């Protein structure tokens, strides 16, 4: 049990810091669009696809590795709450078009990136 808690916690620390770093880097560069959140969600969607494809094909690693990578790292890297806040702010500012594009980019993009992650794994694996 404690190894599971540790695995999730360490993964979450890494994922949250990656998300924070992406926000600092990309949101500061492009003020009009919160690119850091989008990149975090899309890359996290791709990564979780690769990881789930890997873990479904492999029993070499202990379950704690899946908890670390999927629940901890990907769970903290992707961020529905920040996405929701940014889209709500766009709506409050009357930026309906930006909000709609943002919602579609995050939701549809994340699903497509997850599928791409599974495809990437199958292509690499052969």
UniProtKB/Swiss-Prot annotation:
It is a multi-pass membrane protein. GO terms for biological process: cellular detoxification of fluoride. It is found in: Cell inner membrane. It comes from the Bacteria. GO terms for molecular function: fluoride channel activity; metal ion binding. InterPro entries: FluC. Keywords: Cell inner membrane, Cell membrane, Ion channel, Ion transport, Membrane, Metal-binding, Sodium, Transmembrane, Transmembrane helix, Transport. Na(+) binds at residues 75, 78. Signal peptide: none annotated. The keyword Amino-acid biosynthesis does not apply. Pfam families: CRCB (PF02537). It catalyses: fluoride(in) = fluoride(out). One of its GO terms (cellular component) is plasma membrane. The chain crosses the membrane at residues 5-25, 35-55, 68-88, 99-119. Na(+) is not transported, but it plays an essential structural role and its presence is essential for fluoride channel function. NCBIfam families: crcB, PRK14196.1. Fluoride-specific ion channel. Important for reducing fluoride concentration in the cell, thus reducing its toxicity. Belongs to the fluoride channel Fluc/FEX (TC 1.A.43) family. This is Fluoride-specific ion channel FluC. The gene is fluC.
């Amino acid at each position: 049990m404690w190894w599971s808690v540790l695995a999730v916690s360490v993964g979450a620390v890494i994922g949250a810091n990656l998300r924070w770093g992406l926000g600092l880097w990309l949101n500061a560069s492009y003020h009009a669009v919160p690119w850091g959140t989008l990149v975090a969600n899309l890359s996290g969607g791709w990564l979780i696809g690769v990881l789930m494809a890997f873990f479904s094909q492999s029993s070499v690693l202990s379950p704690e590795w899946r908890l670390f990578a999927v629940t901890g790292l990907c769970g903290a890297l992707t961020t529905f709450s920040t996405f929701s806040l940014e889209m709500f702010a766009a709506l409050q500012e009357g930026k309906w078009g930006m909000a709609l594009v943002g919602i579609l980019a995050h939701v549809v993009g994340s699903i497509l990136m997850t599928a791409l992650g599974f495809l990437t794994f199958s292509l690499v694996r052969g």
